[in-house]
A protein has these predicted regions:
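Gly/Pro-rich active-site loop or hairpin
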Residues: 60-61, 170-176, 199-257, 265-271
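Acidic (Asp/Glu)-rich catalytic clusters
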Residues: 32-36, 61-65, 79-95, 108-121, ...
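Acidic-and-aromatic substrate-binding clefts and catalytic sites of carbohydrate-active enzymes
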Residues: 49-53, 72-82, 101-108, 131-135, ...
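C-terminal segment of N-terminal export signals and the immediately downstream linker at the start
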Residues: 24-53, 62
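Hydrophobic faces of well-ordered beta-strands that scaffold small-molecule active sites
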Residues: 39-44, 71-73, 95-100, 124-126, ...
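Active-site acidic/histidine proton-transfer and metal-coordination neighborhood
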Residues: 14, 70, 94, 102-193, ...
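Conserved, mostly hydrophobic/aromatic
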Residues: 43, 63, 71, 88, ...
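N-terminal secretory signal peptides and thylakoid transit peptides that target proteins
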Residues: 1-17
């Protein structure tokens, strides 16, 4: 090969290599752009409960301005269903679900479900169990029975019943794990689950394991982050150790439809919801 031919060959090779590199980079960029993102980011309003108590209309405006499209209620602060529905509409928000205490449902489930339906909720979520109702295996059997009784009532009202976990459901009682028992013994046609990703992780569970063992049972999730060991304190979403990309990548298997940011004790609630919304709206998985 002559010197000139060699130079021409190497120049051509260089151009080709640049083309390959450029194509690879472009393909990588396209692949990244095509990765999934959350269509809507929601907020559990317990995060801003003090703000809601002081100024409910103003708080909903700030929530919408922070980028949230959906909210989950934890109390209505004296407003009627019609007033709540109007405030949601005014701020361009929807509210797929609400946390309603088991005591309220036991006292008057007909009214609770009717009010939820009037607001436009699709799910009524049992948010918590007092300690005296979860001490023994028999207590948990009674809770499962109650959920299976409330489920048909919710369905008759045009709603779905769901249960929200903390960490105590993952602590063995009488040789069983209550969370596993609930998932196994409640009727999937009538009872859904809202997985709190922080509390499952805090309790030693693995969200992906539950998605694999109980597919399509988790239409709702609470997205809250953990600083990790040793104290596992709650932090703003995206500032901690929970691998949301890995979790969200299994959303189809889990059946997740709605993602609600939550922080139980934020130092600055407004800053927390803004930081968390920014992270989730830019997250690709």
């Amino acid at each position: 090969m002559t010197l000139q031919t060699r130079r021409t060959f190497l120049a051509t090779l260089g151009v080709a290599a640049l083309g390959i590199a450029s194509g690879t980079a472009e393909a990588a960029g396209t692949a990244l752009a095509q990765r999934r993102k959350l269509k809507k980011v929601g907020l559990q309003l317990y995060t801003v409960r003090d703000m809601m108590k002081a100024d409910l209309p103003g708080t909903l405006r700030k929530v919408a301005a922070a980028g949230y499209k959906e909210v989950e209620f934890a109390g209505y602060f004296g407003r009627t269903p019609a007033q709540i529905k109007e405030l949601l509409k005014k701020n361009g928000l929807t509210s797929p679900s609400s946390h309603i205490g088991l005591d309220i449902l036991e006292k008057d489930s007909v009214r609770a479900f009717a009010d939820a339906k009037a607001i436009g909720h699709q799910w009524v979520v049992v948010p918590w169990l007092p300690e005296e109702r979860r001490r023994t295996a028999d207590d948990w059997t009674a809770i499962v029975t109650l959920l299976n009784q409330l489920g048909p009532q919710a369905k008759a009202a045009g709603l779905r019943l769901a249960y929200h976990n903390h960490d105590f459901e993952l602590k063995p009682v009488g040789g069983l794990t209550p969370y596993d028992m609930m998932l196994t013994e409640t009727d999937p046609a009538l009872v859904d689950f809202e997985m709190d990703l922080y509390w499952v992780t805090f309790g030693g569970g693995n969200p992906l394991d539950y998605f694999n063992r109980f597919p399509k049972r988790f239409p709702l999730v609470h997205v809250k982050d953990s600083a990790g060991p040793p104290d596992n304190k709650m932090v703003d979403v995206g500032k901690g150790k929970i691998d949301f990309r890995a979790i969200f990548a299994q959303s189809d298997k889990a059946g997740i439809k709605h993602y609600f940011v939550e922080h139980d004790q934020p130092a600055d609630p407004l800053a927390t919801i803004r930081t968390s919304a920014r992270y989730l709206t830019t997250l690709r998985y």
